[in-house]
């Protein structure tokens, strides 16, 4: 379900990545693969796009992406810090320079005490650079998910535009002996 607006955003993002030798990864929950689909709909996406993890279930956020289990227990899966840890985890797990993550409630029912339209998008990049945005989106389930994709692409592009040129093409982790970003990565 691509729209001209997000399709153009994905193409522009990938052109910048290709020009600068940057790789990307995606972690998705509420968007369920839509963000990765937008990116891979662009011809040549494989030059920059490492892959995606669709961690729809809460235990996958912990076990695959390394989101802290106590954070999930205390705040639930729909939380800004969860989104940040998802982005950092997929960046580490897939060996990308930059990553973006989505989590939230598309509706029609509330989840984890959050109303439909509550969405968090986060980016993670080199040297600990990250940002999380809290969104209150309106519309149908499809409209909320599509808007979240657009917001994620916009946030990631803004960070890539602002990144120092010397950071291009740096793989994570900067130190290959570095531990996973969160202690729960790989715990069962």
Q: What is each stretch, according to the model?
A:
Residues 1-188:
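Short alpha-helical segments enriched in small residues
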């Amino acid at each position: 379900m691509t729209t001209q607006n997000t399709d153009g955003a994905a193409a522009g993002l990938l052109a910048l990545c290709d020009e600068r030798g940057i790789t990307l990864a995606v972690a998705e929950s509420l968007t369920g693969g839509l963000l990765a689909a937008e990116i891979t709909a662009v011809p040549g996406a494989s030059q920059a796009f490492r892959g995606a993890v669709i961690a729809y279930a809460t235990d996958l956020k912990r076990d695959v992406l390394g989101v802290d289990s106590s954070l999930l227990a205390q705040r639930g899966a729909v939380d800004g810090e969860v989104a940040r840890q998802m982005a950092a985890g997929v960046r580490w797990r897939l060996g990308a320079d930059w990553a973006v993550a989505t989590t939230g409630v598309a509706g029609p029912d509330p989840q984890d005490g959050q109303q439909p339209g509550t969405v968090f998008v986060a980016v993670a990049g080199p040297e600990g650079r990250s940002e999380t945005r809290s969104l209150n989106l309106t519309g149908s389930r499809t409209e909320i998910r599509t808007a979240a994709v657009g917001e994620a692409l916009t946030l990631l592009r803004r960070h890539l535009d602002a990144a120092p040129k010397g950071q291009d093409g740096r793989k994570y982790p900067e130190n290959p002996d570095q531990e996973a970003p969160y202690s729960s990565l790989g715990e069962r």
